[in-house]
Amino acid sequence: MFKFNEEKGQLKCSFCGKTQDQVRKLVAGPGVYICDECIELCTEIVEEELGSEEEVEFKDVPKPKEIREILDEYVIGQDQAKKSLAVAVYNHYKRINSNSKVDDVELSKSNISMIGPTGSGKTLLAQTLARILNVPFAIADATSLTEAGYVGEDVENILLKLIQAADYDVEKAEKGIIYIDEIDKVARKSENPSITRDVSGEGVQQALLKILEGTVASVPPQGGRKHPHQEFIQIDTTNILFICGGAFDGIEQIIKRRLGQKVIGFGSDNKHEDLEKEALLSKVLPEDLLRFGLIPEFIGRLPIIASLEPLDEKALVEILTKPKNALVKQYRKMLELDDVELVFEDEALTEIAKKAIERKTGARGLRSIIEGIMLDVMFDLPSREDIEKCVITGKTVTDGEPPRLIMKDGTVVNKDKKTSA
């Protein structure tokens, strides 16, 4: 309802009641008016509240034990890696809150490198950390990067992804986390520096150095090379946490050689031949990464090394069932929406884990295996209203037998039926 001054018929501010003659500006809305003074007051209140929220967001960083407990809810195993990441992340944001200096002591930045086989949980750990801390998060693939002047993605595009994840709030992006995957793929081809250009290897490492250490980078908001005349966004990377992950296939041989050289006397080879891959990865040192093909300056920017173990059968079964977002829970929920109870027998879960190990895909391959098993079930069951329960057996996984179906009248279908895939 419009507000008028009864004596003069003037419009009034709906908030403070001042007339249009008493204020400089009166802004009209549908049936309501607000003056310039009230707008200014509202702006101050909103800025104060948002400012205090931002402060809380980064000052109330969970303690390392709390971070690890939350990681345990989503990621199975990898205890040592979780501990390393929890401490590193806590110290990183503690450093930001102290403005990088405590009693004139400058706290240096600690980026992280994660070494572990495919499907061991590197990406999931990084994603979960960002979720715990409620900070912007971006994933980049090192294999798509090339140094400036060559066809491919510029290093600055990594920062653009983070800015986009922060809804173009640069200040928020400057406290985010960037996960660079497949970092082992930009290792140079040999330990010795090459005379020829290595477009996708050493050159990319050199290009990444500055943003890893901390610099003010100019980021093209539309992605760079196709729009040369655009305005650049300035972003300071000093407080961005970089996590670089890779499988580093073959690094265990480098570690083995190093350990073998340090054992004196007979049987030095035999002593280390029995070391499992996981045990070897836990003994990785910066010098091993250097021999693998990372340049010394790049290794220096990643002082914390967290090694992840290959997942065994037991861990894969737990991944299927225990985390909050476990695959079995997800599929069970999907069928529950069609009023069907889904049950995976223990033998079925074990066989799914075995298949993932055979394919050498780790946890990453579990979904595609289950998707193959569940395809016919999820195609047929929504059209049927007579089924109460669907049981996935070991034979369903190994031999492709149809799952056992329990009807609403108690009848069991496919109980003893044996068909090959």
UniProtKB/Swiss-Prot annotation:
The keyword Metal-binding applies. Gene3D superfamilies: 1.10.8.60, ClpX chaperone, C4-type zinc finger domain, P-loop containing nucleotide triphosphate hydrolases. InterPro entries: AAA+_ATPase, ATP-dep_Clp_protease_ClpX, ATPase_AAA_core, Clp_ATPase_C, Clp_protease_ATP-bd_su_ClpX, ClpX_bact, P-loop_NTPase, Znf_CppX_C4. Keywords: ATP-binding, Chaperone, Metal-binding, Nucleotide-binding, Zinc. ATP-dependent specificity component of the Clp protease. It directs the protease to specific substrates. Can perform chaperone functions in the absence of ClpP. PANTHER family: ATP-DEPENDENT CLP PROTEASE ATP-BINDING SUBUNIT CLPX-LIKE, MITOCHONDRIAL (PTHR48102:SF7), ATP-DEPENDENT CLP PROTEASE ATP-BINDING SUBUNIT CLPX-LIKE, MITOCHONDRIAL-RELATED (PTHR48102). This is ATP-dependent Clp protease ATP-binding subunit ClpX. It comes from Bacillus licheniformis (strain ATCC 14580 / DSM 13 / JCM 2505 / CCUG 7422 / NBRC 12200 / NCIMB 9375 / NCTC 10341 / NRRL NRS-1264 / Gibson 46).
